[in-house]
Swiss-Prot record:
Belongs to the universal ribosomal protein uS11 family. GO terms for biological process: translation. It holds the Pfam family Ribosomal_S11. The keyword rRNA-binding applies. Part of the 30S ribosomal subunit. Interacts with proteins S7 and S18. Binds to IF-3. PROSITE patterns: RIBOSOMAL_S11. The lineage of its organism: Bacteria, Bacillati, Bacillota, Bacilli, Bacillales. This is Small ribosomal subunit protein uS11.
Length: 129
């Protein structure tokens, strides 16, 4: 058998100054993906990827840390301004937006793109605590 050589793909530093920050905030986690204007991912992070486990993933602090990590990674590629798309009902929505701004990214627009059903699937039953 032929031996496979260890060829790892090197990260190419792209020079992209404007992009879109997609914040997906669910009841269990917050995922921040920063893309270029065409939708190609440049950097991403999530509360779970940063080591938060269980109920700590759904906190605003975890969302803040995820947004900071994604912002720092995108700024290495030359990102300066972002448009923010927020999706979902989670606790980390506002915290993630504030963290992107605090990290040094200029926010040009904030859009709520939460999908709303026109009476689609039956929702989960109400919790009784």
């Amino acid at each position: 058998m032929a031996r496979r050589t260890n060829t790892r793909k090197r990260r190419v530093r792209k020079n992209i100054d404007t992009g879109i920050a997609h914040i997906r905030s669910t009841f269990n986690n917050t995922i921040v993906t920063i893309t270029d204007v065409h939708g190609n991912a440049i950097a991403w992070s999530s509360a779970g990827a940063l080591g938060f486990k269980g109920s700590r993933k759904s906190t605003p602090f975890a969302a803040q840390m995820a947004a900071e990590a994604a912002a720092k990674a995108s700024m290495e590629h030359g990102m300066k301004t972002v448009e923010v798309n927020v999706k979902g009902p989670g606790a980390g929505r506002e915290a993630a937006i504030r963290a992107l701004q605090a990290a040094g990214l200029e926010i040009t627009a904030i859009k709520d793109v939460t999908p709303i059903p026109h009476n689609g699937c039956r929702p989960p039953k109400r919790r009784r605590v």
